[in-house]
């Protein structure tokens, strides 16, 4: 359906623009990570990885959840309700956005560690999985199935291989801890999405005012949710200590 593809392009324009901003910010990390790799021990490097991965999860899950609940209200204000996509398509688009970005830190570490040969075959594997799943899922879910296929193929290849070799060859550690953490983060993001969905049921304001109110309410609610989940954890305290130390050094 040509009109459906046209409607989808409005969403991908917004998502790709946000992705470009976030990717540009993250690209600056690669040189920093590379220099840090050379100046510290594997254990210190591993600790820094965990801090950066935690921070990236907070930023990317926040952006993804906000995108999920605000992109339709934004499109409605911008182009009108006639240009809105099925919620399942929106979910599939945002999931593809999230699975791409959540691998930023493992991918950056793999690059700076020079682990290229180990993952050279995975793009081909990912392409075959993507094609197969796209055919199957498109028949079941339509357009959203294609985006779900992209997310699944990416998770089964790039997201697995990058972290596996970074942990196995870069840190000399078992990668199972990373995958456990990734699963926990996914569940936290999922329940955060459910939490914001429940809140969204009580906000009936439409238009530009509604968009602004939703942005404020959802943002405060989601950041409060993350704080409640993480504030007693080791990774939160360690990250807070690191940021506080960096700010103190600047002063």
PLM features: residue spans?
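Membrane-interface junctions at transmembrane-helix termini in multi-pass inner-membrane proteins
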Residues: 94-126
């Amino acid at each position: 359906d040509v009109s459906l593809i046209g409607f989808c392009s409005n969403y991908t324009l917004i998502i790709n623009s946000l992705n470009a901003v976030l990717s540009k910010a993250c690209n600056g990390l690669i040189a920093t990570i590379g220099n840090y790799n050379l100046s510290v021990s594997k254990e210190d490097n591993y600790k820094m990885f965990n801090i950066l991965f935690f921070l990236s999860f907070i930023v990317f899950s926040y952006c993804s959840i906000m995108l999920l609940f605000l992109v339709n209200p934004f499109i409605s204000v911008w182009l009108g309700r006639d240009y809105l996509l099925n919620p399942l398509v929106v979910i599939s688009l945002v999931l593809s956005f999230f699975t791409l970005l959540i691998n930023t830190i493992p991918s950056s570490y793999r690059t700076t560690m020079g682990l290229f040969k180990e993952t050279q075959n995975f793009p081909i594997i990912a392409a075959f999985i993507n094609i197969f799943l796209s055919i199957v899922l498109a028949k079941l879910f339509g357009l959203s199935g294609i985006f779900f296929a992209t997310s699944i193929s990416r998770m089964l290849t790039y997201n697995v291989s990058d972290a596996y070799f970074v942990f196995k060859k870069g840190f000399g550690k078992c990668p199972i801890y990373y995958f456990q953490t990734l699963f926990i983060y996914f569940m936290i993001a999922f329940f955060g999405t459910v939490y914001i969905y429940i809140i969204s049921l009580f906000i009936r304001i439409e238009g530009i005012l509604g968009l602004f109110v939703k942005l404020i309410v959802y943002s405060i609610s989601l950041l409060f949710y993350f704080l409640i989940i993480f504030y007693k954890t080791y990774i939160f305290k360690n990250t807070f200590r690191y940021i506080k130390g960096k700010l103190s050094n600047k002063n």
